[in-house]
Amino acid sequence: MRAIRLAAALAVLLAACQSAPPDFAEFSSPQSPVNVATHIAENVGACWFGGERSAFAEYSYAPELNSYSNRPRVLIVPKAEPHGLPKLVIEASAASRGSSVKLFGPMMAGPEAQAISRDVARWVGGATGCG
């Protein structure tokens, strides 16, 4: 009986030590931050909001491409709260060779995170269209 309790306790401890999947993603692009963010924004509009993607039905997007901080971004916000906190941020910033594109926000911890990352990775690489 004691061995069973010990095994159960060990299983609980090991499960607690498991790291959660990351709630962000980061990609590199040879393009300038404004160019890569513009390309991403065009594809976000066409693929996520121009089609039948039900995961984005409750949201709208707000491209902020004219950035004084040189960090243009695309925000995914709830339709009901367009000025509320974004649920997804796609931000481009200058890097040593081109741009770094970061994705973060609550949607990156949700069921669409992998599909979001795959789409943005393609667009950062210069591809167009929906996956």
Q: What is each model feature region?
A:
Residues 18-131:
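Ser/Thr-rich, low-complexity intrinsically disordered terminal regions
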Residues 1-17:
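Sec-dependent bacterial lipoprotein signal peptides
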